[in-house]
Amino acid sequence: MAGNTIGQLFRVTTFGESHGLALGCIVDGVPPGIPLTEADLQHDLDRRRPGTSRYTTQRREPDQVKILSGVFDGVTTGTSIGLLIENTDQRSQDYSAIKDVFRPGHADYTYEQKYGLRDYRGGGRSSARETAMRVAAGAIAKKYLAEKFGIEIRGCLTQMGDIPLEIKDWRQVELNPFFCPDADKLDALDELMRALKKEGDSIGAKVTVVASGVPAGLGEPVFDRLDADIAHALMSINAVKGVEIGEGFNVVALRGSQNRDEITAQGFQSNHAGGILGGISSGQHIVAHMALKPTSSITVPGRTINRMGEEVEMITKGRHDPCVGIRAVPIAEAMLAIVLMDHLLRHRAQNADVKTEIPRW
């Protein structure tokens, strides 16, 4: 499995399985001298952690991160930072009945086709449990971006099922279990989740992530365009089936006169491009959206096959999220932070001496 690393100068490599002993990651490229403690990482991990509300999986994992290396006397040393989270609440017996059965909509079938075997306990490496380490690594990037450049990264749920959620108040996001920015829709979300639980079904969601304070000039055309790398990072998150930058697919219905972000002496007059032009940041807010499919881990009976190719009917037992989009919010923030930090370091390495007289807003 060769796809465990993301980034060039800021590099994150994760390891571990859903029901293994632990999850871990190695973070390379962190500059020396940055104050860093486990508490700095724990806040976002707690936001992603399972079992924190009745709307998410009831697997109870404390997700306490340990810094194994790369930090001395409370500051980064410039060497590899090793992070570890122990798994403590595995219930592998929940999966014994599907050892020889491929869950529809999951990676069981494709993992076995590729590797000739699979860890059937909670999906093994294909489980979203792996994303805990992305969030830990992303917290390092978020801290660096905020303290050194004033960059703020925020995410929220902007749609669940057929319920659209307007970004009315960012402060609301941390005050409810849905990461919802629209307090008027909380009752509707609660009603939907209760219905799903009763039916044993699940629902999809849309997550929006925004980075403010990003300087103009980040991105490496042509193959490492900033939007291309953001799309790559967000698409690598479990259950994500689509990514949009700025207006995204809405541009299909727009005229050029509507979509172009006109510029005056006061700055850009709109941000349909989502803060990226020609693969390079424009200095505006970077705005990305991702669509997450409804999880296939449901108790509604469905058809599939076993290893012998025989058709069988199955339900998925275990503890699962009825809407995986809820806990995906801090994961999306982490992946955007990882990409932005990598591109900031790359930009400084080649273009640190570049000066222009063009206005910046």
UniProtKB/Swiss-Prot annotation:
FMN binds at residues 125-127, 238-239, 278, 293-297, 319. It comes from the Bacteria. The keyword Flavoprotein applies. CDD domains: Chorismate_synthase. Pathway: Metabolic intermediate biosynthesis; chorismate biosynthesis; chorismate from D-erythrose 4-phosphate and phosphoenolpyruvate: step 7/7. NADP(+) binds at residues 48, 54. Keywords: Amino-acid biosynthesis, Aromatic amino acid biosynthesis, FAD, Flavoprotein, FMN, Lyase, NADP. GO terms for biological process: amino acid biosynthetic process; aromatic amino acid family biosynthetic process; chorismate biosynthetic process. Its cofactor is FMNH2. Reduced FMN (FMNH(2)). InterPro entries: Chorismate_synth, Chorismate_synth_AroC_sf, Chorismate_synthase_CS. It catalyses: 5-O-(1-carboxyvinyl)-3-phosphoshikimate = chorismate + phosphate. One of its GO terms (cellular component) is cytosol. The keyword Aminoacyl-tRNA synthetase does not apply. Its EC number is 4.2.3.5. HAMAP family: Chorismate_synth. This reaction introduces a second double bond into the aromatic ring system. Belongs to the chorismate synthase family. Homotetramer. This is Chorismate synthase.
